[in-house]
Amino acid sequence: MKIILFNIIAVYYSLSFNSSLHDFSVPVMEGGNRSLSVYSNKKVMIVTLPLQQTASADSMLYSLDTLATAHIYNLKIIAVPSVEDGYTSEQKNDLMQWYRSKLDTNILITDGLYTHKSSGNQQHPLFNWLTNDNNNGIFNVDADSPGFKYVCNSAGKLYAVLNQHTKMHGSFVQKVLKAQ
């Protein structure tokens, strides 16, 4: 009985949040802003990007690109360089060139965003929603390093958070993408 009551409360609690991924917009690295409402009816994965060109960073970007290509019709990937992880506007052109050499144009690359909770009022509204259970209704997980992944269903509701150690090409990511 307690389990049933808990499940009913959890479902009610998660349904009572009206905001979704589709309520936000982000600045695009190549210029302009993109409303995320254009991704309704697609799953979306938001990933914080590495900022240093290393073999492991190249491997991560390659895996991200491979994942996006494999799920091109039902998944949109939004890649985010984080200010707290070291992004500066002076790096923008070099980073854009590096990212685009590894990532296809079907992956949206944002301009640098404040992603960490520690940024307080500077935290981008999208990441304030992604990282706070008071806003998204389910998860309270900070994006405190490159490689964090937030997955939203086609209705724009957050349903999974994967840390930087979860490999893009792993079976667990495939299971997460098949859920919801």
Please annotate each region the language model reported.
Residues 24-44, 66:
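A short beta-strand-turn-helix
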Residues 3-13:
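Sec-dependent N-terminal signal peptides
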Residues 13-21:
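N-terminal signal peptide
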Residues 57-123:
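Structural microenvironment flanking redox-active thiols in thiol-disulfide oxidoreductases
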